């Protein structure tokens, strides 16, 4: 057999062929570990994830080698094409012979190509294709049997697994008629009888760890990403563009007639103060005020400039808040699965506490939002989310006086609607602690 190792396309194809052989070794090792995984300290889930990661790496290397194979073929054809249209001196004799024999396309005929090389390439390509197809079926029915039994797709791309891959760990447990504590107790008792408690503990630990990390990452994204995007949008796009358009492309100064009226009131106040200063200076100090009109003019221009900046800020803040809401809505839609996981994790974390701690955290959250000291917190919160309005005390007072009332009604409905059905003892403890808190506040007010 001729030495084809120096041909670049054949070298890439051979590399993909060797990786395909390595895939078969990984599958054999997985089947051997699967039979003895419960008798060793290694978890079956870790073996599954390790095998899946190794297979995905092999698939990526195979596709990368096949891509190199196609690129090498393309460059070989390109070099052959350029060689026949601009041949070296040593190839002119061969080109003349090919034209004499009647090859009008000026290319190498197929009978001059080694048939053994073609058969070898076709055999390896067929073997790689069969290996990848068999790997997809094997992953579906052996590596992830639970996903195939439910009739769900493992992934959108059958080989690369780049989208929609379902993990072997179930990250969300739906709430049914029976409480999950009862079903888990039955599962643990069954695992103890079958001597499978260790894999069950590892599974629950992996479930809790994945839920916590996923929930914290999602909450961090909900807090940071909309704020960063809206801030960058305001600083580098909306405010400079709106300021340029407002000052150069249109002649209006005031955004609304109310701003014009306020500016006139300020100018009148400035004139009255200036006249008062002039009268005081002439009557008591005996001095003549110089440049009174210039001072009034400068202060008037400063007042108009401030109103102009307020109008620009209103438009810029409105666009920024719209971008913030769009980004936040996009995160909610794109992270629907993460939202379900976060909901499940929060429920598990809350229901795992004692009744006293549950009532304590409920009181802490309600007092922070609707307690006697909450208006200061709401004033700070409304100053961050302005909804296009410039900071105004009347708007903040209106928000503080209405939104906590609505939130208080919703919280009371949730407490009496859900907690009474799930755990009446929590409601009783909550009422007791709430009465003690109210009694303490009344005594404090009487002493004052």
From Swiss-Prot:
Keywords for this protein: Antiport, Hydrogen ion transport, Ion transport, Membrane, Plastid, Potassium, Potassium transport, Transmembrane, Transmembrane helix, Transport
One annotated Gene Ontology cellular component of this protein: plastid membrane
Cellular location(s): Plastid membrane
Transmembrane regions listed in the UniProt entry: 47-67, 213-233, 314-334, 395-415
Pfam families: CemA
Keyword Signal: no
An example molecular function term from Gene Ontology annotations: antiporter activity
Keyword Ion transport carried by entry: yes
Function of the molecule: May be involved in proton extrusion.
Gene designation per UniProt: cemA
Cross-referenced HAMAP family: CemA_PxcA (MF_01308)
Source organism of the structure: Aneura mirabilis
Record-given protein name: Potassium/proton antiporter CemA
């Amino acid at each position: 057999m001729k030495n084809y190792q120096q041909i670049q396309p054949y070298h890439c194809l051979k590399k993909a062929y060797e990786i395909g052989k390595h895939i078969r070794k990984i599958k054999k090792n997985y089947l051997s570990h699967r039979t003895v995984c419960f008798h060793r300290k290694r978890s079956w889930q870790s073996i599954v994830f390790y095998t899946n990661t190794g297979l995905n790496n092999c698939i990526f290397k195979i596709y990368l080698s096949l891509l190199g194979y196609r690129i090498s073929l393309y460059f070989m054809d390109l070099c052959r094409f350029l060689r026949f249209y601009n041949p070296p001196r040593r190839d002119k004799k061969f080109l003349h012979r090919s034209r004499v024999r009647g090859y009008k396309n000026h290319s190498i005929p197929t009978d001059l190509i080694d048939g053994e090389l073609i058969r070898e390439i076709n055999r390896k390509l067929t073997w790689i294709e069969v290996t990848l197809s068999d790997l997809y079926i094997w992953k579906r029915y052996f590596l992830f049997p639970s996903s195939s039994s439910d009739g769900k797709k493992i992934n959108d791309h059958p080989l690369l697994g780049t989208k929609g891959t379902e993990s072997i760990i179930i990250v969300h447990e739906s709430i049914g008629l029976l409480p999950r504590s009862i079903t888990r107790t039955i599962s643990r008792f069954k695992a103890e009888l079958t001597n499978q408690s260790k894999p069950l503990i590892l599974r629950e630990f992996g479930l809790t760890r994945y839920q916590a990390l996923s929930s914290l990452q999602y909450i961090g994204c909900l807090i940071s990403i909309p704020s960063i995007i809206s801030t960058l949008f305001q600083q580098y796009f909306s405010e400079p563009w709106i300021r340029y358009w407002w000052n150069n492309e249109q002649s209006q100064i005031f955004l609304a007639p109310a701003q014009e009226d306020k500016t006139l009131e300020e100018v009148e106040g400035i004139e009255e103060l200036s006249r008062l200063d002039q009268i005081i200076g002439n009557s008591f100090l005996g001095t003549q005020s110089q440049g009174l009109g210039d001072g009034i003019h400068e202060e008037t221009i400063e007042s108009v400039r401030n109103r102009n900046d307020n109008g620009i800020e209103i438009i810029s803040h409105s666009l920024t808040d719209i971008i913030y809401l769009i980004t936040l809505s996009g995160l909610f839609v794109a992270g629907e699965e993460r939202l379900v996981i976060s909901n499940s994790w929060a429920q598990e974390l809350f229901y795992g506490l004692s009744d006293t701690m549950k009532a304590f955290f409920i009181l802490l959250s309600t007092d922070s939002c609707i307690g006697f000291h909450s208006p200061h917190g709401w004033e700070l919160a409304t100053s961050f989310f302005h909804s296009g309005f410039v900071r105004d005390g009347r708007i903040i007072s209106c928000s503080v006086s209405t939104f906590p009332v609505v939130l208080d009604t919703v919280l009371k409905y949730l407490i009496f609607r859900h907690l009474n059905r799930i755990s009446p003892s929590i409601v009783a403890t909550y009422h007791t602690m709430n009465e003690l808190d109210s009694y303490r506040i009344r005594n404090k007010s009487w002493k004052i």
